Curated annotation (Swiss-Prot):
Organism: Klebsiella pneumoniae
Matching Gene3D superfamilies: Jelly Rolls, Spore Coat Polysaccharide Biosynthesis Protein SpsA, Chain A
Protein name (database record): Mannose-1-phosphate guanylyltransferase
SUPFAM superfamilies cross-referenced by the UniProt entry: Nucleotide-diphospho-sugar transferases, RmlC-like cupins
Gene (UniProt): manC
Documented EC number(s): 2.7.7.13
Matches recorded under Pfam families: ManC_GMP_beta-helix, MannoseP_isomer, NTP_transferase
Amino acid sequence: MLLPVIMAGGTGSRLWPMSRELYPKQFLRLFGQNSMLQETITRLSGLEIHEPMVICNEEHRFLVAEQLRQLNKLSNNIILEPVGRNTAPAIALAALQATRHGDDPLMLVLAADHIINNQPVFHDAIRVAEQYADEGHLVTFGIVPNAPETGYGYIQRGVALTDSAHTPYQVARFVEKPDRERAEAYLASGEYYWNSGMFMFRAKKYLSELAKFRPDILEACQAAVNAADNGSDFISIPHDIFCECPDESVDYAVMEKTADAVVVGLDADWSDVGSWSALWEVSPKDEQGNVLSGDAWVHNSENCYINSDEKLVAAIGVENLVIVSTKDAVLVMNRERSQDVKKAVEFLKQNQRSEYKRHREIYRPWGRCDVVVQTPRFNVNRITVKPGGAFSMQMHHHRAEHWVILAGTGQVTVNGKQFLLTENQSTFIPIGAEHSLENPGRIPLEVLEIQSGSYLGEDDIIRIKDQYGRC
């Protein structure tokens, strides 16, 4: 059986404003009801696999846990990186965790934010890779190129190992992102693949090769795993140890150096959705080449991508535009300038604007909070608490709160007193009062919260007790 190891780190800044640092693209629902992370998991349906292991940023832990819970795939299988150290250490953490009890699984390493539309072809390639990984090779999946792309690294194939629909080859070399002229030459030669960043190998084989070429990375990761906190859902890697680990990609650390690298070609309608232009290319279009998502309308317009999270967007007489509207930001640009989105993100960071980091709607382990109005002296929030969800028992030094129940039933605790509130009822939480809110019902609890006081920062939440381990 295969152990899927899903790399869910990264910030996805090229899909701003939908993708934010605290809610990056791998958690977005761009093509239906499932997020990209969830699609990565469901795409493996039909293969013999263990429960997936997901590696993510510590700040995304509750997002990942909730999305795995929705798939019934949550079982102490989330590794939390306190800092990003690239793919070689991340895979090492997964391999060390997987071999703790003497097992040596075949690891299928996947990115959480890729699209692979031809699932049968993908599964066929996995089965071919499985044979060679089981024999001790380190297999990488090379994407059959259809254009002289300069945004991907390339893999040059060497000697063919067999003759089949997915002929595996020895890896001749890995190549950095080329200029246009070299990319065209690679495409014409037929000897090169795009580097997908997907791999398969035995866990212990990867660790032995890492020990051979980068023992410093292995040593740091081993120390981190030995000191990890294994909770019910999360495997928390300690910051003070892991921050000493070198930052290195698996290509540089292992794949370019090993004598056992094999590449399996994959022609399965793959995309890493690395820009708004790429998303337009892989999305279904109308007769004029427009992609419309959400509340959008066009007239006499061609080849546009329009995505509206909430507001109506109407476009008339335009072409080749990307228009993305969220609750707190709007992006308008020429589709050919998709790579320049990062300049907007850099501007927001430099000017300490929160829009690069978080959406107006913030996700919590208990549900979500939509910041409707935000001022220095008061905030108005629309809060949704999922069934069974609960605030921590907490208090504030500088703010009071008013809660109005819009829908559902809330169990409120204030200074030890517990009572129920239902629709159209309200309560007041004074400054300094210990308080909590829980949803004991079976439907979402909707609450209008008004915060007022001299200071409204998140660091004025003094947690006393918390079922999510945030104290």
